Amino acid sequence: MEVPADSSSCLQVKRVHSLSVLKNKVSCFFLTIYWANALSRDSARVAGLDSEVRVRRDCELREGGMPSVLGTLDESMAEDAFGLGVDGYSEGASMFTADVTRLGRPLRRRAAGGDAGRAGEGAGAAGGLGRGGEARGGAAEAAETAEALDFQPPPSKLFAGRVERPISNDSIVTEAAETLSTHFDMSASTSSSSRGSSVVIEKSQAHEAAEESATGAPCKKYLFASSRDRLQLSLGGMEASLSSLHIPAAGADAGGAVHSVASFSRTAPALVTTSKALTPSQRYRLRREQNKVALQNSIKQREVFYEEQERGSRGRSASLKGVLGLPHAVDELSEDISDYLGWDVPVVSPTTGPFLAAAERSEKHTDRRPGVARSRSSTYVDHTMPPSPIPGIQKTSDLEFFTETSKKLSCVYLDTSKETSKSKLYERSQSAELLPIEFKAASDEGMEDLKLVSSGKMAVCSNSRPSWLPPKDTEERARHERQIRQTIDIASLSQIDRTKERAERDTRDEKNRKRLAQLVERGLVRKSTLTELKKICWETSLPPDSRFQIYTTLLQSDTAKLIEEQYIDNFDQVDALFRSMQFPNAKLAEIQAMLACTPCTANVAPADDLIYLLQLKAISRQGLLLGDPLLVHHLLQVGCYSTREIWVLVNILQLTCFNETTKDKYDRRIISSRGTVSTALSADKTFAQEFNSKCLNFTTWWHLMARLDHAVFMWCLDIIVAENSQPFKSNPIIRDKLNGKDWDYYRDLHVVVNYRIICALTLTVLLSYHFGFNNLYDLSFVDPAFQIIGPEQGDLGDVHATFIKKWHHNYKKF
């Protein structure tokens, strides 16, 4: 730009230019604040104004020099914004123009005074002070008039870092130029989106600006709208004048140049043709605008759905304009929907919701607008009904619309929660089985529910450590669990072995019983038969129904039965004697005291047969002997013998197996220092206090037998009888030789005195079952319920078999 020769005029131009720029900034600042408040306060009122009123007010404001923002601005608004009337504002109107866009679009400012000043400078540079000088003069006068106003400029520090370069009319195209088209036909509104920005059309000849500044009556046209539909409503019938509008170039050199308003599309920005080269800042802004437009186009190409909705909306809007005669209502509806779409809010209206079924109208609805025919099948839309988010046009409210969905979701969530809770409780119930016994006892007492025990507690709890001790560390826990598993494996193998042995024992018992029946039929008088019988007795107890026959055969021969005939009192005679006499009370008291000291009869009422047989035994020739209560009691427990048979068996057993000779030998040999018992007990010094005649005698042996249960007692009795048998075939009983002989003579010839078998039994108890008592003498004072081999130790079959095996092993030592 060429600087004028006159320095005073140059300084004046610079000052006017600076003041113009400053005033433009101050005015735009206050105008921005005003419209930020005015848009939020008066948006509903402005949107409801009639199109004719808006056009009339726009014309009035343009005549007064007040720019039209969003289509309307009255005098009161101007007074509120600047404290001036329309006339006062018109004085400074030539200094600036403002463009405020809708929905947060950037504010565009255009300094008309600066354009006029630059036009004047261009004219001066051309070599004259013609219309350009006049324009400078008009600008100076406008500046002086503006200085008279009460505007207080902001502090200079706000503008110290930013001095904008004046922008000429032919610089670059802004966003407002993109929405401008040379044809403002009504039918052209359906070709692009309604999201356009404000359009500013002005006459920019420099000489006309100078004339207008001198007269104070600007003739500029400011059209602010948010879409082409708003532009159509604002312009009204001015399409012809705008379509033929042309702007000549400023300056004398450019008198023949014609600048036509180019046709701008939404896809490519169009620039106003100019003969001047762009400055670097203009090229930079040009590239920035082009990039912005390209980005917008790229976004629009991806918004296929919304573009289709807009095209459908415009098509239906155009049809409704002709049918209903309500163009402004349809335009506003389409515009509002476009605003929703700009913010990606799905909305629906009766014209833009073809996918929604038409709501059934109530027959009682009588609110009909006069002059408009409505029908059930029509697409009439009440223009007062704003578009709303889906499903706003339904009869039901949003709450009712989503009630069913929310109920289903709630059911799903509740079911899922219940199933999850059940699975967690099931897992914890399963894991609770592995907790220590102390935890289970605490749970039973109500201290804590094991079903609520978490995995964290399970991690520190162990069956092998009490709960009051610190938890095990990882290594110790793993080591103990490994040892426990090994122990369990060994126990499992032992259990497998025991199960196998039980099965083998059952098979063996069945086989032995069959073999025993064959031996009884063959006769128990041979030595070979007795050997096999003894083996069977060590493995299997005798059948209860065969005991009487086997006992009498083994102890007195099956043919002679001399003991029963000569050395035992006849049962019938003793019974007759008992019935014919008064039994002494002292003797009865003695019998009851004996039964009270016997463990197997101490806690139960003695049977009548037991007392009866003991009374008979008391009045017999042998008298009541040690062991009679036990023998009578267990034989009665068998349940298959009569009182006569029990009488015979008890007397035979006392005369043969437990006679005086056996008793004497047992008492001497059990405590012999060179005997088998002494040799076995001497290895353990703890038996030194028991190895005496007080603890080891025939009486204490019966104390031992009283602590055995019925099954093992009878099995032991079977073995003792078998070991006291003899082969009567090789040593037969000759009745003639024994006639008139006493019992001692008969015992020496035909009775086997086997004390070793009962000594082996005592040794077995002392070595393997010495639990719960100090010695055999104190055993009689122990609780009557105590048993040496009791059911609490496991399966009786296994326990009894183990006891018999150990007894047999110790018997072999004798």
UniProtKB/Swiss-Prot annotation:
Q: Look up the domain of life of the source.
A: Eukaryota
Indicate whether Cell wall biogenesis/degradation appears among the record's keywords: yes
Key words, A-Z: Cell wall biogenesis/degradation, Golgi apparatus, Protein transport, Transport
Give the Gly residues compositional bias ranges: 114-136
Give start-end positions of Basic and acidic residues composition bias.
360-370, 472-482
Provide the protein's localization: Golgi apparatus
Residue ranges with Low complexity bias: 137-149
Q: Name one Pfam family in it.
A: SBE2_C
What do the Gene Ontology cellular component annotations say?
Answer: Golgi apparatus
- List every stretch annotated Disordered: 109-160, 360-395, 463-482
Q: Taking the first listed entry, what is the main subcellular location of this protein, grouped into a coarse class?
A: Golgi
Does Transport show up as a keyword for this record? Answer: yes
Could you mention a single GO BP entry for this protein? Answer: protein transport
Task: Describe the family membership recorded for this protein in Swiss-Prot or TrEMBL.
Answer: Belongs to the SBE2 family.
The free-text function statement in the UniProt record for this protein reads: With SBE22, is involved in cell wall integrity and polarity processes like bud growth.
**Name under which the protein is recorded:** Protein SBE2
* UniProt source species: Eremothecium gossypii (strain ATCC 10895 / CBS 109.51 / FGSC 9923 / NRRL Y-1056) (Yeast)
